[in-house]
Amino acid sequence: MTTVTRPSKVDFSQRPMLVFWEVTRACLLACRHCRASATPDALPGELTHEEGLALIDQVAGFGRPYPILVLTGGDCLLRPDIFELVDAATARGIPVAMSPSVTPMLTSDAIGRMVDSGVKAVSLSLDGATAATHDGVRGIPGHFNQTIPAIRALVDAGLKVQINTTVMQSNVHELADIAKILADTGVDIWEVFFLVHVGRGEATGAITAEEHEQVCHFLHDASHYGFIVRTVEAPFFRRVVAQRRQGLPAPDGQLYERLRAGLLTLLGEPRERSSAHTASTRDGKGIVFVAHDGEVFPAGFLPLPLGSVRTTPLADIYRDHPVLHEIRSMNFTGKCGLCEFADLCGGSRARAYAATGDPLAEDTACAYEPAGV
């Protein structure tokens, strides 16, 4: 079996690329697919301001190059000391990204504070190309018509803007139209989430394995239009990108053909080289998640508790926990264990766990049949 790998300049066994900190569970929205099952008010046990500063010190404890600290939620803007925490992190030289919700909290003053505090990137969610679809997912009538101006305001402020889209049965047909919105607004990154059944996402319609494959081929095509394309919980996108670069033809499925035709109609022929993101990170390898109460998990969608930053330094948890050693060992079962793309991809460990209770099982959303099967 020929193994397909991608060299990395960072040893992900020692240092993550991304540290996600869920600074609060509070959020004014009630999105159908919310990982956090967010609530209007903060939950008891949130890390205090002093504990938050201590966590920032722990992130710095990984050493340089520091991981990117992604402040998420809930809605990170509902945490009263959020910009004090941002200032503390940037003063240490830690790159900071923020993931606010589009609510009345996202004001021009808040955007100005992001710029002044040195925030490197901001991500917003866009889950449909129409008000009916997006608002249906977000649970707030009129939210789409608030989101588009918010995207433009962030771009106009000079911030790097990432748009997060969660793919599900109700919006998969609008992906080409969403790509058009991103191109028109000058967005830098499109991060496409594929459902894992945690939180409120348990009640949301996931697409099939074959549809996952066709969407990934579409996303490869979309990466030629001026914005970076990344995926969350679909590491097999990296396998698709590698195969396409090796000359594999696109599939002839109806979903792919429809999305591809929409892309050509809306944006014309591809005009740039692919900017698909293929860093071989996955849950617990290059990624670690700190919940609102300081509990540590391999990722936000993989609810395997690893310890608490209140009692153990984050770097020690990340480097030494046996669960993370297992995930990084690539001793996968099923198709993932036989796959020549295991290092580049590795499958969604979160989806494997959600489906089987075993984080080393095969990813049930992957349609690929490895050569060893």
Question: Which ranges hold each PLM region?
Answer:
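Conserved alpha-helical substructure of the radical SAM core
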Residues: M1-A121
